[in-house]
Amino acid sequence: MRFKLHDVHIRRGLCCVADSYISPASINSGIRALIQKGEYLQALHLYSKHDGSSPFWTSVFTFPSLLKACSALTNLSYGKTIHGSVVVLGWRYDPFIATSLVNMYVKCGFLDYAVQVFDGWSQSQSGVSARDVTVWNSMIDGYFKFRRFKEGVGCFRRMLVFGVRPDAFSLSIVVSVMCKEGNFRREEGKQIHGFMLRNSLDTDSFLKTALIDMYFKFGLSIDAWRVFVEIEDKSNVVLWNVMIVGFGGSGICESSLDLYMLAKNNSVKLVSTSFTGALGACSQSENSGFGRQIHCDVVKMGLHNDPYVCTSLLSMYSKCGMVGEAETVFSCVVDKRLEIWNAMVAAYAENDYGYSALDLFGFMRQKSVLPDSFTLSNVISCCSVLGLYNYGKSVHAELFKRPIQSTSTIESALLTLYSKCGCDPDAYLVFKSMEEKDMVAWGSLISGLCKNGKFKEALKVFGDMKDDDDSLKPDSDIMTSVTNACAGLEALRFGLQVHGSMIKTGLVLNVFVGSSLIDLYSKCGLPEMALKVFTSMSTENMVAWNSMISCYSRNNLPELSIDLFNLMLSQGIFPDSVSITSVLVAISSTASLLKGKSLHGYTLRLGIPSDTHLKNALIDMYVKCGFSKYAENIFKKMQHKSLITWNLMIYGYGSHGDCITALSLFDEMKKAGESPDDVTFLSLISACNHSGFVEEGKNIFEFMKQDYGIEPNMEHYANMVDLLGRAGLLEEAYSFIKAMPIEADSSIWLCLLSASRTHHNVELGILSAEKLLRMEPERGSTYVQLINLYMEAGLKNEAAKLLGLMKEKGLHKQPGCSWIEVSDRTNVFFSGGSSSPMKAEIFNVLNRLKSNMVDEDKAT
């Protein structure tokens, strides 16, 4: 029977305790043999039994092994004892023992002791031993393990001053650690590369791998590729992994996947890191086809249950929007670790399957899988999106029930939840409890307040952020939210200051920041400033075009909006539903039916997805162009009807005199479970107004207040006065005005003035006109209305006086106008105008129509 040599030594070591004669060689051999087998505690016990009887028996070669055992067990007590023996024996300057002591103290968590050992060794009388690179490497590595990077780099530089020539390990730990921590500059990295070349250290594959990683961290992918090409032996899978992950992390996903295929074709034995790196590239590029191929390779390699690979597969399918495939991967995993659950919850959350994410979270708890901070942050984000305040608050409570570390991600998610749900006190409590308020935290609070329409509070928080920490530089997300807050408040002056600060930092070039600036100037009535921002941005981005098209529509420049849309098409940029919706608003304001129908057809031909907003815009366009039947067809085919959809159709029927259908649609809306708002009732009262349904209008007005608790605004009151006035109920209209809980504005008195003139009520007409003239003394149309009223009542002197006063003030009435589109041409007609080139034909038609109406009146 054959015995291994170290087994013989072990038996000797164990038996020598009982022997009367102690053999130092046997004990040393036994200790080293035990340590080689990993039986560290037995080795230390064996050492302690004999150290007291004779401290001089231990060999100089045994101490490094003993210190290795102390490091493995992190046993500081034994380590100090052995250190004492080393000092007594005078071997503390031995480079092997010094290295072992430094490593032991670092492993046991006492860096200061390691520094004392190293300093004593490096300052020893033996100048030759102080140049041993192994000890320096241990000390540099120790500094880095304790994240004391400045001291580590200082030690490396001191080593060079001492004339110690770094080896491949020295350079690799400096390069890899400093790159990882971001405390390394490109110039320093290239200097180290040059040092390697000059000293023929470029043959070490481990060091070259660290160099490749360094260049990728610097964003120098070409330099990384050059180093990779120079390596002759490419059999090491770690090298391939660094390249695959590096290109993927640099956004060069195609090269990352090409390298994956190259490694596979060169028979490199791929490991889990290879697959996770390649799947990461597929996730970034949303390359589901290649991702499926890698999935097949994973199954062939038997890694389909590897937690890291499975997590990457779930992430890849999630980023590609393939939630079904992610569910399949998840269900096939036998041992579902927390990382797997988290990846599936994140997949649901990222793809707007919020309720599925919450269901899976509940299932996790049923399976007694304890969530971590990553789980809870995703769950809270889902609650925020779904508006589930109470559920989110219950999840927040779990942070207090169990010792889950509250990360900045969780705190930011909670800030967004509470801010979005309008729970400002809770949001501020979370914010104040944060030890470190980073950019994400400030951004979450500001963004949440903006989404909830609390723009003043958002700007105050932004000001507090600048006062709290000057070193924080707002990112594009925060500046977008701040600009949106300025737009919501129409705070032009502050918005200009924000714009100026963004020009200095270069953030204005960001597409979302630029679009928010366009929106700001649009809402402040400065389309020319919005255009300047637009022209400074990339013309290839759809968001910028949409913002500018919407800006022109909002500022009553529909023709410019339509022209800009056509320019966008001519530059090869295909519109989305937002573009179509914005330009439809412009077309609606011009009542250009042909353009509207043409755009509708274009949308259908290109297969642009029609969301609710787009369909609402189409309904609005057809209603305003007088084609309510087209609007009705779109309405009936809509599966999801928003409140705006119902309001548009009710308004459409009412504006075309079909009050009965409008009222019927209102009943249908209530049956569908949609609650009306103030706009709904305004449309209904307006419908009754157009059709002369006085009692129905009065009932709806009372119904709005009593049954739905909606307080009427000035438009509701104006429509009611107009309804009563048109029906000739002038005294009731005047009593209605006097009973209003708010002071009547000019629109109310204008309605009463028009009705007074129609029904020849001079007294109320004069009263209304006087009220109007006090409110708007420069309004010429009021003078004209009152002059006409005087003339019709035979009060010519009063009319002449008022006409003289009007001329004295230089006032005149803007003539009303109407237009009609015929053969793709818009014909405009002004009240009292006769400048049309076809005026003769027009007057002939008008005379014939008048004769026909007179004849029909006589016949009836």
UniProtKB/Swiss-Prot annotation:
Residue ranges for the region (Type E(+) motif) are 824-854
User: Single GO molecular-function term?
Assistant: RNA binding
Quick one: where's region Type E motif? 748-823
The keyword Ligase belongs to this UniProt entry's keyword annotation: no
Database matches in PROSITE patterns: PPR (PS51375)
Q: What keywords appear on the UniProt entry?
A: Repeat
Q: Does the keyword RNA-binding apply?
A: no
Could you tell me what this protein is called? Pentatricopeptide repeat-containing protein At2g40720
State the gene name recorded for this protein.
PCMP-E26
